Swiss-Prot record:
Start and end residues of each NR LBD domain: 185-419
Stretches the record annotates as Hinge: 156-184
Lineage, opening ranks: Eukaryota, Metazoa, Chordata, Craniata, Vertebrata
Compositional bias per record (Gly residues), positions renumbered to this chain: 443-454
Assembly information from the UniProt record: Homodimer. Heterodimer with a RXR molecule. Binds DNA preferentially as a RAR/RXR heterodimer. Forms a complex with PUS1 and the SRA1 RNA in the nucleus.
Record-listed Omega-N-methylarginine modification sites: R34
Purpose of the protein: Receptor for retinoic acid. Retinoic acid receptors bind as heterodimers to their target response elements in response to their ligands, all-trans or 9-cis retinoic acid, and regulate gene expression in various biological processes. The RAR/RXR heterodimers bind to the retinoic acid response elements (RARE) composed of tandem 5'-AGGTCA-3' sites known as DR1-DR5. In the absence of ligand, acts mainly as an activator of gene expression due to weak binding to corepressors. Required for limb bud development.
Cross-link (Glycyl lysine isopeptide (Lys-Gly) (interchain with G-Cter in SUMO2)): K172, K401
Bias-annotated ranges (Polar residues): 62-71
Protein name: Retinoic acid receptor gamma
Ranges of the DNA-binding region feature: 90-155
Biological process annotations from GO: anterior/posterior pattern specification; apoptotic process; canonical Wnt signaling pathway; cell differentiation; cellular response to leukemia inhibitory factor; cellular response to retinoic acid; embryonic camera-type eye development; embryonic eye morphogenesis
């Protein structure tokens, strides 16, 4: 079992060697080793070493020794390296050529211009008489005449197409979906995690959106009406996250103490991930599970405060990943079941439980995007970003506690729990006014608390 000091060190950063098995998922790929040409390794002082001047009486002896010894040979000077290959100037613009491309000697600029023009079926227009002079100074002034010059000097359309098809074939062979087949066990795991996520978090298209005009146009320190609504929805979201955790294979097999430790550590991470997947960039809004849709200003006024822009920026960074529900569920599970959290009783057991989740996400993401091999590590890097946001969120809770008129809602309080942070609230254990009987954790022993998710 790792010591507290070791866990504290591990919790500082997410990456190989902490929560993830480093050997299984390397993110750094060493470059190919290159040997130095043998003659470049020799000191210049040893190249072409001649015989030193000798006295006349020794010269004949030296010559005789050299001629009669069959074992001693004077090394000849190394032949000079061949001169670098010189190509004719670019046939299109007369600039320095980098080689033969698409059938003619051409520079990198004209090679790239011709390739892009053919691959994208570009149609250009000449604003003069279609006889512009093309050289290295004027080549960017008229794309029409430059392309015509490419054809005139012999550049081949077919060579571009063949090159493109060859690259596509290589990518297809390297990343064929058949090479990322999932075992029956991983297929079953993915199905269970995906179902757990979908049944505890409806997708954006399933929600009936509605909006409010409350403080929609200007930022204020805190809109109490929006805060009450947000805290109510956040409480329900935490309950759903606990339910999600209980449905993950193996989670309830952990000790009760470790289940609570993992939930408290990751709950805010998963909450942020979930709300950010409901970001609509066209309107710059986020939608909650009941359909309430708030713009950036309203999110600020609902309690996010200075955290708002950081959360919206993260939501924007998720968009290029185009994660589906299965990937979001797997990433949430990996975020939750992580052995580098502090105060775990059995971190090794947690790590063992996380390994198949990592493998499932890796293979699923690669099978879904055969030509994008780096999507899996990019997803994992988002967990690091989420932890940074959660740290800022805990800091925001300190100032928010002084802005709201009553106590922090119980589940939110426990999610961010730091004994010193909420010491003044210890005498107010009652539920938040907006909390209902539904706010009790399923299977819990205490109302509104993360007492026992098992």
């Amino acid at each position: 079992m790792a010591t507290n000091k070791e866990r504290l060190f591990a919790a500082g950063a997410l990456g190989p060697g902490s929560g993830y098995p480093g050997a299984g998922f390397p993110f750094a790929f060493p470059g190919a080793l290159r040997g130095s040409p043998p003659f470049e390794m020799l000191s210049p002082s040893f190249r072409g070493l001649g015989q030193p001047d000798l006295p006349k009486e020794m010269a004949s002896l030296s010559v005789e020794t050299q001629s009669t010894s069959s074992e001693e040979m004077v090394p000849s000077s190394p032949s000079p390296p061949p001169p670098p290959r010189v190509y004719k100037p670019c046939f299109v613009c007369n600039d320095k050529s980098s080689g033969y491309h698409y059938g003619v000697s051409s520079c990198e600029g004209c090679k790239g211009f011709f390739r892009r023009s053919i691959q994208k079926n570009m149609v250009y227009t000449c604003h003069r008489d279609k006889n512009c002079i093309i050289n290295k100074v004027t080549r960017n002034r008229c794309q029409y005449c430059r392309l015509q010059k490419c054809f005139e000097v012999g550049m081949s359309k077919e060579a571009v197409r063949n090159d493109r098809n060859k690259k596509k074939k290589e990518v297809k062979e390297e990343g064929s979906p058949d090479s990322y087949e999932l075992s029956p066990q991983l297929e079953e795991l993915i199905t269970k995690v995906s179902k757990a996520h979908q049944e505890t978090f409806p997708s954006l298209c399933q929600l009936g959106k509605y909006t409010t005009n409350s403080s929609a146009d200007h930022r204020v320190q805190l809109d109490l009406g929006l805060w009450d609504k947000f805290s109510e929805l956040a409480t329900k979201c935490i309950i759903k996250i606990v339910e999600f955790a209980k449905r993950l294979p193996g989670f309830t097999g952990l000790s009760i103490a470790d289940q609570i430790t993992l939930l408290k550590a990751a709950c805010l991470d998963i909450l942020m991930l979930r709300i950010c997947t409901r970001y609509t960039p066209e309107q710059d809004t986020m939608t909650f599970s009941d359909g309430l849709t708030l713009n950036r200003t309203q999110m600020h006024n609902a309690g996010f405060g200075p955290l708002t822009d950081l959360v919206f920026a993260f939501a924007g960074q998720l968009l290029p990943l185009e994660m589906d529900d299965t990937e979001t569920g797997l990433l949430s599970a990996i975020c939750l079941i992580c052995g580098d959290r502090m105060d775990l009783e059995e971190p090794e057991k947690v790590d063992k439980l996380q390994e198949p989740l990592l493998e499932a996400l890796r293979l699923y993401a690669r099978r879904r995007r055969p030509s994008q091999p780096y999507m899996f590590p990019r997803m994992l890097m988002k967990i690091t970003d989420l932890r940074g946001i959660s740290t800022k969120g805990a800091e925001r809770a300190i100032t928010l506690k002084m802005e709201i008129p009553g106590p922090m809602p119980p589940l939110i309080r426990e999610m961010l729990e730091n004994p010193e942070m909420f010491e003044d609230d210890s005498s107010q254990p009652g539920p938040h006014p907006n909390a209902s009987s539904e706010d009790e954790v399923p299977g819990g022993q205490g109302k509104g608390g993360l007492k026992s998710p098992a």
